[in-house]
Amino acid sequence: STTVNARLSTDNVNFKGDSSADVGVEMLNVNHDFGAVDVTLGRYGMTLGNQGGWLYNSSYGFDGAQLAADFGKVNVAVGYGQFNSARNTQFDITDCDDPANKGAFIDNHDTFYAKANADLGAFDLYANYYTNMESKAQLDYDIWGVGLVIPVSQFRVFGEYWQDTTFKGEDDAWNAGIGYGMKDLKKPGTWSLDVAYNNVGEGVYLGG
């Protein structure tokens, strides 16, 4: 099956008045499902990190193509394109002239990524890899991360580790936490609560 997904956005509009505002399409993509494999083309969401995407989270943050495969307890995805809103908020644009700050800005540069997650029964394991494909030293980045979730009855213990191998200095980030409950947006009244400690180096943070 093939689906087209789009979302319109606009400035503040009062439908009872005579004011006007610009309307735009902030997310638009086409997805085709081949069964265990599906392909997505266009502008789609991207999430990096647990806790809802602490490293990076945008429902329209990537322009490109993705191939994903579902093997039951193991899922993998690879993609190519460009971030359109990924910026490390610790830096100004002039900082990119300093090789020590490479990786600070990753938007609008060709990017390859690969993601995988596995349900191993006693725990869930996942890994992510993102790399810049333009070979520009001042904008180069090479980010990888691994994470673990261990369910214990209604509780869960989780943690992550990330590193930007091209950054000098504070190039990594990690967290550990505990959660309770299971939120399901299709079931009113369900909820979840997570508490975590995050240690984030400036070289790996993307403004999530």
Feature map (PLM): residue ranges:
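Outer membrane beta-barrel
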Residues: S1-D92, D110-Y126, D171-G207
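Short secondary-structure boundary segments
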Residues: S20-E26, N57, Y126-P151
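Loop-centered beta-sheet repeat module
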Residues: I93-D140
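Active-site proximal loops enriched in glycine and acidic residues that flank catalytic Cys/His/Asp
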Residues: Y129, G159-Q163, Y197-N199
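Oxyanion-binding "anion nests"
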Residues: Y141-Y180
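Intrinsic disorder/low-complexity signal
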Residues: T94-D97, G159, L193
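Short, catalytically relevant binding-site loops at active-site mouths
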Residues: N132-E134, Q163-F167, G201-E202
